[in-house]
């Protein structure tokens, strides 16, 4: 079905989405998905405006526009809604109608039926999807700006005119420059260093016992900083650009993301996932940079780690894809970011007939790169050895189009601001060859860009 009310307009003037988001009057449930690193992965930036439907999962409860729904589950409602509301997108843009939002790691844990031994210390929904009437989309490759309205909250032409007028007014506005003032921060980890190293040793013991082959071990940092979340976001996107970043502003919490990792992209029934395993910091000189890149390229430990996750992701996709369609398209690729190198693989397949995003999510979430193999047992070990719940960290943030397509990241390099504190998870994959000191130091390297942005 094609929504005949939908209007898509290319603006005569190119205005970056980051500037528009910064200077437009804020709205409740504001979400900005940001491709600040423009490459083959970072192509579009998306702003949602005029929300009309909010789906939330809070533990075992499901809410539609803040009203509890008891007659159907979140997953079944989403599956049914996507089937009933399926709408063609005739444009080249990633979506013309649909939702932006997130799924937390805790959503995935409950989806897998794994109980937690930890108390809730942070109160946010496990999953949020917000369907918007209007979108502002930047084609970061072509440097073009688009407005889309669907005529749900008010006539599409009227809403388009309002948005266009508001945006054109911003073209003369100077965007607020990233804050240069340095803020003191205090960082509190939920592990002492030696305790974290012991948990890694315990995880390695489980590997030798045959319980697991690989698992992801993380620690949680709580940071006290007076810097505003939106200032953190704009500093982070400037100094550590990423293809899958974002800023999500909800009632009592905000999410700042600079993820380099794609979890799921679904395009006309074709599924892609790109797990990351293997990290090296960037060098301070060109010579050191090249040495560290080569070190990662030649690391048998990191390649072995990634291969195990590739096998897991292939198995997950085979549950939901057409027989024989799942293939490894990219085995060991080095991706460069401002502070680190990553080792990445690509796995693709064709979604089985009569399946949609809800089925894909249930078959694959949470991602294998941030859990381990076998997934269920690895997640049990994670709950036993980590010192608290992960909450949003290692979940997914992205968009869901009503034409059936989607693109979701892995929520790493992601900080949650709630009740005046920032919460940051950092971790890495553990194998039989892991060295506890190296793994601990790697978590600090992964935290560096966000800790810098918080100052």
Regions found by a protein language model. Give the residues of each.
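Extended alpha-helical targeting/anchoring segments
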Residues: 1-455
């Amino acid at each position: 079905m094609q929504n005949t009310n939908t209007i898509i307009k290319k603006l005569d003037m190119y205005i970056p989405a980051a500037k528009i988001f910064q200077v437009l009057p804020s709205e409740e449930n504001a979400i900005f998905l940001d491709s600040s690193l423009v490459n083959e992965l970072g192509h579009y930036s998306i702003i949602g405006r005029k929300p009309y439907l909010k789906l939330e999962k809070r533990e075992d409860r499901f809410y539609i526009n803040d009203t509890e729904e008891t007659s159907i589950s979140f997953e079944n409602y989403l599956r049914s809604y996507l089937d009933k509301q399926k709408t063609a997108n005739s444009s080249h843009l990633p979506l013309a109608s649909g939702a932006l939002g997130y799924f937390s790691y805790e959503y995935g844990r409950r989806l897998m039926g794994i109980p937690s031994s930890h108390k809730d210390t942070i109160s946010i929904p496990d999953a949020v999807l917000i369907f918007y009437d209007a979108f502002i989309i930047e084609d970061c490759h072509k440097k073009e700006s688009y407005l889309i309205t669907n005529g749900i909250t008010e006539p599409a032409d009227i809403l388009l005119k309002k948005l266009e007028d508001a945006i054109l007014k911003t073209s003369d506005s100077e965007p607020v420059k990233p804050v240069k003032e340095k803020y003191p921060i205090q960082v509190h980890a939920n592990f002492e260093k030696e305790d974290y190293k012991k948990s890694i040793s315990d995880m390695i013991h489980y590997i030798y016992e045959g319980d697991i082959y690989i698992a992801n071990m993380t620690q949680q940092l709580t940071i006290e900083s007076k810097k505003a979340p939106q200032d953190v976001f704009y500093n982070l996107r400037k100094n550590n650009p990423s293809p899958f970043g974002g800023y999500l502003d909800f009632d009592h919490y905000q999410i700042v993301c600079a993820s380099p990792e794609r979890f799921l992209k679904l395009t006309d029934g074709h599924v892609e996932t790109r797990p990351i395993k293997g990290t090296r910091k960037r060098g301070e000189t060109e010579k050191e940079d090249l040495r560290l890149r080569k070190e990662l390229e030649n690391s048998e430990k990191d390649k072995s780690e990634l291969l195990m996750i590739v096998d897991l992701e292939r198995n997950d996709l085979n549950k939901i894809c057409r027989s024989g369609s799942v293939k490894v398209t990219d085995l060991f690729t080095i991706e460069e970011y401002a502070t680190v190198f990553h080792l990445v693989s690509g796995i693709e397949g064709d979604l089985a007939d009569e399946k949609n995003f809800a089925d894909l999510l249930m078959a694959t979430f949470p991602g294998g790169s941030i859990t381990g193999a076998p997934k269920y047992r690895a997640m049990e070990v994670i709950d036993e050895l980590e010192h608290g719940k992960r909450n949003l960290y290692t979940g997914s943030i992205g968009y869901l189009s009503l034409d059936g397509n989607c693109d979701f990241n892995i929520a790493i390099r992601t900080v949650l601001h709630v009740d005046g504190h920032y919460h940051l998870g950092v971790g890495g994959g553990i194998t039989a060859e892991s060295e506890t000191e190296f793994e601990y130091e790697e978590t600090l390297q992964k935290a560096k860009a966000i800790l810098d942005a918080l100052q």
